[in-house]
Amino acid sequence: MKVHIHPHYAAYESYIRAIPSEEYEREEVYCNRRNTVERVRFGDKDFVIKKYKRPALINCLIYTWFRKSKAQRAFEYAELFLQQGIETAPPVAYIEIKKNGFFHTGYFISEYLPYPLVTDMFGTEMEEEEKKRLRHDLVDFTLQLHLNKVL
């Protein structure tokens, strides 16, 4: 198991290393399909864990030898965004699990930010004015990515 923890979150190492056992209380589950996204509380802080399910065999080989895992890339992109002044959830850690020498499962952990979900702008739970503001913020964010040559 490869565990990379941002030095700022070293105090949470025991919680982070226990994530693959999934023996923690989930505060909220946002997505539970191919990948799982859930909010958890470790100590005094809320975090988001994204678990990347086992990829197809060819991708297991690619992530083992040729390409960084999605978890590692998510961590590195979050660091890059913050360095470029693009607001995003601070990256906390990533975990890569190998079985029989091959990549199997990845986890990306970030701080939880209490913002509305992008998917909320398509549902009926928000007032129309709030949906409009969220769509505007999404366009501004995308523009910021372009101006910083990220997209």
Segments (PLM) and residue ranges:
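Juxta-kinase regulatory segment immediately upstream of eukaryotic protein kinase catalytic domains
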Residues: 1-27
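AlphaC helix of the protein kinase catalytic domain
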Residues: 118-127
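Histidine (H) residue identity feature
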Residues: 4-8, 15, 104, 136, ...
